[in-house]
UniProtKB/Swiss-Prot annotation:
Keywords associated with the record: Cell inner membrane, Cell membrane, Lipid A biosynthesis, Lipid biosynthesis, Lipid metabolism, Lipopolysaccharide biosynthesis, Membrane, Transmembrane, Transmembrane helix, Transport
Quaternary organization: Heterodimer of ArnE and ArnF.
Occurrences of domain EamA (ranges): 53-112
Family: Belongs to the ArnE family.
Protein name from the UniProt record: Probable 4-amino-4-deoxy-L-arabinose-phosphoundecaprenol flippase subunit ArnE
Taxonomy of the source species: Bacteria, Pseudomonadati, Pseudomonadota, Gammaproteobacteria, Aeromonadales
Length: 114
C-alpha cells in the first residue's frame, strides 16, 4: 500500500510540474496581468496537485524510512521527461533516455527494491 501511495506522490508532483508548464504556455498565448496569472486555472490546478502530493508525502514519511522513500522521488525526473515529450512535443535526446534508465535503476537500488 505504501509503495502505491509513493507512486501517487510521484504522479501528483509530476502533474504539478506539467500544469505549471501549461500555465506558462497559456500566458504566452494570451498576455495577462500578474493577478490573472496568479489565479489562472492551470496554476491553481498545479498548486492543488503539488499541495496534495506534499500532504501525502508527509503521511508517507511517518510510515517509510526516508532513505527508502526519497530515492523513489527521482522517478519524477523520468516522468517529467516522458510528459514533456508526450504533452509538449519536446525533443528528447538519446542521452536523455539513457540518463532516465540510469535514474530508474539507481532509484530502485537506493530504495532497496532491486
Amino acid at each position: 500500500m505504501d509503495m502505491l501511495l509513493l507512486v501517487l506522490v510521484c504522479l501528483l508532483t509530476c502533474s504539478g510540474q506539467m500544469l505549471q508548464k501549461q500555465a506558462v504556455i497559456s500566458w504566452q498565448r494570451q498576455p495577462c496581468s500578474h493577478w490573472q496569472k496568479l489565479f489562472s486555472p492551470w496554476l491553481i490546478a498545479s498548486v492543488v496537485a503539488l499541495g496534495s502530493g506534499m500532504l501525502l508525502w508527509i503521511y508517507l514519511l511517518q510510515r517509510l524510512p526516508l532513505s527508502m522513500a526519497y530515492p523513489m522521488l527521482s522517478i519524477n525526473l523520468v516522468l517529467v521527461l516522458i510528459g514533456s515529450r508526450l504533452f509538449f512535443h519536446e525533443q528528447i535526446s538519446y542521452h536523455n533516455w539513457l540518463g532516465a534508465g540510469a535514474i530508474i535503476i539507481g532509484a530502485l537500488l537506493l530504495g532497496g527494491l532491486l
